[in-house]
């Protein structure tokens, strides 16, 4: 397979097509957001609470709103209000919650319910997919 070369100018041009709208949870530095943009999507907002990650994201995509709180505190109403949209109007609610507790390479069930170091915090991460499911239920993306 031949590599696909791109730069931020191309990403911006492709994103201006506005073919679909996206909010990305657990966005990190913007890997999935870049893919959506290259596919012609408009990333309206992201959620990321790790400072180094959201600062990197903001440097690459300064026009995207960043919800900087823990996803557990993010509510559908926050998204609707900030983006001036209603339930069911967003096309894609993307999320990549930490998965080490489920991974064959990770500790799997043995670590379930335990707090562990995640970036510069100590917290449970195995339950974050429930938060993603909650937001999918409440936002009701198309």
Residue ranges and their predicted role:
Residues 1-142:
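Conserved active-site and SAM-binding loop architecture
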